[in-house]
Each structure stands twice: as structure tokens, then as C-alpha cells.
Amino acid sequence: MTLTSALTRHLKCPELFRNLANEPHPSVAGQRQRFSVFNPSTGELLAEVPDMGAADAHAAIERADAAQEPWSGLTARARSDILWKWHRFILEHSDDLAAILTAEMGKPLGEAKSEVQHAAAYLQWYAEEANRIYGETISAPSTDRRMLVIKQPIGVVGAITPWNFPASMVARKISPALAAGCTVVLKPAEQTPLVAGAMFALAKLAGFPDGVLNLVYASEGDAIGRELCTNPKVRKISFTGSTEVGRLLMRQCSDQIKRISFELGGNAPFIVFDDADIDAAVDGAIQAKFRNAGQTCVSANRIYVQSGVYAEFAEKFTERVRTLKVGDGFDPNVAIGPLINQEALKKIELHISDAVQKGARVRSGGRRTGSSGTFFEPTVVTDVSKTMRLAEEETFGPLAPLLRFDDADHVVREANDTIYGLAAYFYASNLKRVWRVAEALEYGMVGINTGRMSSEAAPFGGVKQSGIGREGSRHGLEDYLDMKYLCVGGL
């Protein structure tokens, strides 16, 4: 991999990351193509990355399989100690990791630093959880038997991470696998492979044995994903991305009856009831909608506001949105970075055009901005109805549609009227309403009077077509463990 000065000038320790982890393995090395990674804010070339294929993925799986038995044979304390070292190195080099993240993904540097801290928190959590993998004893039906349950690592894990949180998603998927005693083959998103490589470089310093962590770069993920899903030595796939790709991977895994953890698309409702603290709701909506320029799977995609407070909320919310500065993530005053590519720009423009044609009104923003890069103004659209595309499809950009409602039961039905079920938010003060709405919303995660709810201590995941399984918390570890029942007779 070759890094350019457009990236290294932002780094305190460029030599540490100059040769990022896992250049092609000698068994499959030779003449190969490379793909380019660009800064979406400036268009500058950041790096030339080896473009790997199915043969590389197969070789990585073989290395992971060879390392599986010795890695799982270590004590939980030994695995925990290495995770702790990785955690420490991540924190020591957090500024450089954040700079890499901002350069290749575009998000504001402050958000990038928070993401790196979040990644480190997952490593810390699972370094601790590695020592808490417990079995159980069962009361036997006869005196000559003893019955118990033990938990063992499932084996080699294939992980596929997205571009929108390229550091925290690596840690969230890999750390529980490593804690459980599994080896890993990781395929990072082609738009943002550099921070994953930097994290793996630090993992090498932490002392992970050869073959435990394996990185496969590729400009096109189809061949890599197919090899991970169909190779019988891979026992589990963990994927974060679109529901469409999730369906494809699930089909590819079906012949192997492979265990899967999928965190897929969302269409998150954000509901403001008339008894809500409006100023707090505005703050929460800004967080839930515009973090990472709206490019998050839990981004508020539909903002429902009860009629009695609609005008007040719309005015205060729009006023706040107008203060959000758009630009290069390295500018300390910037709140909204670029969209990831031109396709993302076209989608947000399509959603706005469709809404306006059907009677919506643009209150703020609505245009591309900047002389270069993929920037779009944070946009507020009012008088939105459910028939508009921006209310039915995940926009994945800084576009906030405001929908009016009168009846609480009706808005819950509207919020649930989607194939997705990842995250939902609502603001209210009436305790009876809080409990009823929280239980009625068909989502895996519900934020009540808050616009942010992700934590390493909480189970992250969705229902319906938003995913399978949970990441984070003690529950996230269970997805990497097999339960084995032992029955001892003749006693």
C-alpha cells in the first residue's frame, strides 16, 4: 500500500502507518491491480491499495483456520491481555486514527475522534467480557448423572464493515470474536480501508499471533463476500450494510447453514409529542439527523411532530439547522462533512425533487454547496406526506422531512409501517405515554428523550428487515459462542 502526502501530512506518526497491515500474502502475491482511495472533501488521492480477490480471501481463511485452534486454546486472560494492549495502542494513536478517518470518509474531525474513542470502548468492554464466559450446571433427573453446559468459540469469522463508521464497526465486530476465541477475516469497505489497516497495524504491535487477524482489501466486494459465505471453514458472517446486500449474503450462506449477524438498513422515525420539551427535542433531532451528515443507519429519516407544537418545532429546528457549517472535516468549525460519493448526492436531490413535486416545501438548504467535493446543504422540508419517497426510503444524507400528526396511536402505526425496524426516537413527558409508545414501536432500539443511544454496553441491532443478532453488550459475545451440553453418566 502506498500513502500520499495528502494523508501523511495530517499524521503525527506517519512511519507507523506507512506500511499498513497485510500486504498481499506471498502465496497469492504477484502482479495485481491497485485501487485508489480519495478524500471526498477535496478529491485528493490518499492511497493506492492492493486490489485483492477470491484467491486472497481463500488464503486469508486458510491462515485464520490454522490459527483458530491455538488462539482458542489460550486462556481467556491471555486473550484479554492482548485486547487490552490493542485498546491502549488505539488510545495512544487516536489522533492519527481520527485524521485517517476524516481524510478518507470526510466526517468532521471531532466526530472522528469520538468514533475512535467509541472503537476503543468496544475493545475495553470485550477485553473485560473475555473473562466472563460462563457455562452452567443442570439438575440431573437421576443420581448417577451430571449435566452441564460449556461455551466454546464457533471458529473462523468473516466480517464485512461499512464506510460510514469504518473504525468503530471494526472494533464492534472483531473484539467480541477475539474475546470468544475466534479468528477473523475482515473485508473493510472499499471507500474507507485505511483506518482498518491502521488499526490492524496497531493490533500487530499488541501481539496478536499470526493468522488471528486477517485483512482483505478489495475495490469490489462480490468475490470476497462470496468466498467468505461459501467457504466451509468460515463458521460465521458478521455484516453491516444495506438490506439488499444482506439478503444476498444470507442466500450465499444458506448452503453452509452459517451463523450470521446482520445490521442492515433503517428508516428511523423521530416523534415529537405535544407534551415534549421542545428545545430538548430540537437538540435530539439535530443529533439524530445530522451526525455524520445523516449517513448513519440510525439516522432520523422521518420526523413526526404533533400538530399543537409543529409550528414551534419547525421554526426552532430550522433556525438551528441554518447554523450548521458545511465543509472539509479538518476545519474545526465544520459540523457537516461531505457525502460519500456522487450517487449519494443524486439520491438526496431525487428525494427533494419528488417531495416538492408532491407539495412539500423546502424551508432551508436544498442545494449542493462548495466548489469541490460532495457537499450538500443541511435541508429541512415541511408539509411532507407518507407518499413521498423521502418518507418511504432511507435517504442517508442531511435531509430532514417534517410530518404533521394529530393522534398518538395513528403516528405509532405510521412509524411502524415499514419493512425496517432498527431504531426509533420519541420525545414526551407523560409517563403513561412513554411506556405505551416505547412498547408499541416495532424497533430493536428506542431512544426516549435522547437523540443518541449507541454504547458498547448496550445491545445494538434491529428487527424485521433491519437485521439479525446483536452487537455490543454481553449479548454480543454470545453470537460468537457455541453452546455444548455435556452429560456424564455411570456415576
From Swiss-Prot:
Binding positions for NADP(+) per the UniProt entry: 163-164, 187-190, 241-242, 264, 394
Active site per UniProt: 263, 297
Keywords annotated in UniProt: NADP, Oxidoreductase, Plasmid
InterPro entries per the UniProt record, alphabetical: Ald_DH/histidinol_DH, Ald_DH_C, Ald_DH_CS_GLU, Ald_DH_N, Aldehyde_DH_dom, Aldehyde_DH_Superfamily, Succ_semiAld_DH
PROSITE patterns per record: ALDEHYDE_DEHYDR_GLU (PS00687)
Pfam families per the UniProt record, alphabetical: Aldedh
Gene Ontology process terms (BP): gamma-aminobutyric acid catabolic process
Similarity section: Belongs to the aldehyde dehydrogenase family.
Function: Catalyzes the NADP(+) dependent oxidation of succinate semialdehyde to succinate.
Name this protein carries in UniProt: Probable succinate-semialdehyde dehydrogenase [NADP(+)]
Source organism: Sinorhizobium fredii (strain NBRC 101917 / NGR234)
